[in-house]
Amino acid sequence: MHLVIVSGLSGSGKTTALHVLEDVGFNCIDNLPVSLLPALVAQIEIHKDQAQKFAIGIDVRNAWQDLSLFPKMVSTLKEAHLPFHTIYLDSHPSVLIQRFSETRRKHPLSDKSTSLEEAIALEQNLLEPIRDAADQTIDTSHLNLHELRDLVKDRVVGRTEATMAILFESFGFKHGTPVNADLVFDARCLPNPHWKPHLRPQTGLDADVVEFLEEQVTVQEMYADIEHYLTRWLPRYQANNRSYITIAIGCTGGQHRSVYLSERLKKHFDQYYQDVQVRHRDIHKHQKHHNHAPANS
């Protein structure tokens, strides 16, 4: 039996997260009053020997007095020795405002006397006890719908299977550092295929770029150092009950060097861990700017 509590700001993706969990076999209950959590836990405890999975959505539609009780409810769950964890979905206020504008939905706390900005600020304050007690916080500011679905699935499914999910994510520093990264490695000091005209339009997935980078001594030295570091410390993360870890590898544009390193690391650690993923966040962004600026990568 496993219990996941999902909370977060309105517009941050809580409903999407619950739908993902429902798709992978969780029994989902949305907008559960916090005051009813002990009663639900008691029922779950009766059937805790059964292989069931539950996901509960808790949000600002609760009375504010109930939300303040959440830390006490977490203590109750721990005392019952139930396997559970809490996910909190967050997002920057400007992104939330844009999402509400695009969907034309009304914020649950906004009214004639409360602006959208004020409603978001009030919600942040009301949900603070849940955010502080959460095991995982996911910032969805820069995630689209599909990326959020994949991230929730990777992290929750990996945790319920008692494994540590590992994500290698390549990116370009010029596009910003991934907000959910646990470890960040900087590959901008390595020889850059961008300055080879025939390699410029290619990526770290292409054979010519791979061949070029494998011929560079410094590239191989950095790869060996990262591999050694992760080999040494990933078991410690796993022993500390981590359900996931995101390892970001960055170069300037996220097209060549970071892609190559991420792919190679993924291939190596696939041999030792059950759930290893790779994601290339910015690999195609250079195509949009290729004719306008020298987007180094």
UniProtKB/Swiss-Prot annotation:
The keyword ATP-binding applies. The keyword ATP-binding applies. Keywords: ATP-binding, GTP-binding, Nucleotide-binding. ATP binds at residues 8-15. Transmembrane segments: none annotated. Gene3D superfamilies: P-loop containing nucleotide triphosphate hydrolases. GTP binds at residues 59-62. NCBIfam families: PRK05416.1. Belongs to the RapZ-like family. Displays ATPase and GTPase activities. PANTHER family: RNASE ADAPTER PROTEIN RAPZ. This is Nucleotide-binding protein CJA_2809.
